[in-house]
Curated annotation (Swiss-Prot):
Organism per entry: Methylococcus capsulatus (strain ATCC 33009 / NCIMB 11132 / Bath)
Keywords: ATP synthesis, Cell inner membrane, Cell membrane, CF(1), Hydrogen ion transport, Ion transport, Membrane, Transport
UniProt cross-references to Pfam families, sorted A to Z: ATP-synt_DE (PF00401), ATP-synt_DE_N (PF02823)
Family indicated by similarity: Belongs to the ATPase epsilon chain family.
Origin: domain of life: Bacteria
Record has Glycoprotein as a keyword: no
SUPFAM superfamilies registered for this protein in UniProt: Epsilon subunit of F1F0-ATP synthase C-terminal domain (SSF46604), Epsilon subunit of F1F0-ATP synthase N-terminal domain (SSF51344)
Protein known as: ATP synthase epsilon chain 1
Molecular function via GO: ATP binding; proton-transporting ATP synthase activity, rotational mechanism
Membrane topology, record value: Peripheral membrane protein
GO cellular component: plasma membrane; proton-transporting ATP synthase complex
Subcellular location: Cell inner membrane
Amino acid sequence: MAMTMHVDIVSAEGEIFSGQAELVVAPGQEGEVGIAARHAPFLSPLKPGEVRVKSEGQEPLSFYVSGGMLEVQPYLVTILSETAVRAKDIDEAAAQEAKRAAEEALADRSGRMEYAKAQAQLAEAVAQLRTLENYRKGRA
């Protein structure tokens, strides 16, 4: 039996996932971070992307997070994000529309703040679509 840790994924709306896992992979600012039980404690900001949770004997679970914070303790992983959604619940049409709107705003280039906001919105939309694509491929 593999060692496990407790994982909590929490959004502004409430708890999205709480359970035991062998491995968590999250989108850290410097790249993907893989966490197993007894990992050294640390805090890391997250960028928009896919969080994968692998539990023994179960299919991996996939979630989209809009960024946030990752806290790691030896037997506890907590992910706090403004938005967290199970991959299977992502609204593909809404994500495609958000991507299109962000691309239009980037093409406009009317102001620095609007450009930065459009870049962030585009990154979130692309991350949602990539999470959904990975889920559908069974990569979760």
